Amino acid sequence: MYCSIYKSSKKQGAYLYIEKKDDFSPVPQELMTMFGTPKMVMVVNLEGRKLASVDIEKVEVSLKNDGYFLQLPPPPENLLEKYKQDKAKRNEK
């Protein structure tokens, strides 16, 4: 299965996978508005391939069922919360 991957012009780290190059008709208009102008990254064959930060099966299922897959970046790490947890662990010892 081939798909086209686009990056968002509005949300850093967000990528949109669609079945047909430049055919955004399956993507809800609200999502396209939030995504901004899509910038083509690549066309890729998903068969026998691993993707760095997303489960390939989820991509394939979403493409078949919805006609698109949205990859969002992981949430930013809360450094203050991490510091508090580390400090609490040190105090337990």
Curated annotation (Swiss-Prot):
Residues 1-84 form the YcgL domain. Coiled coil: none annotated. Pfam families: YcgL. SUPFAM superfamilies: YcgL-like (SSF160191). InterPro entries: YcgL-like_sf, YcgL_dom. HAMAP family: UPF0745. This is YcgL domain-containing protein VSAL_I1068. It comes from Aliivibrio salmonicida (strain LFI1238).
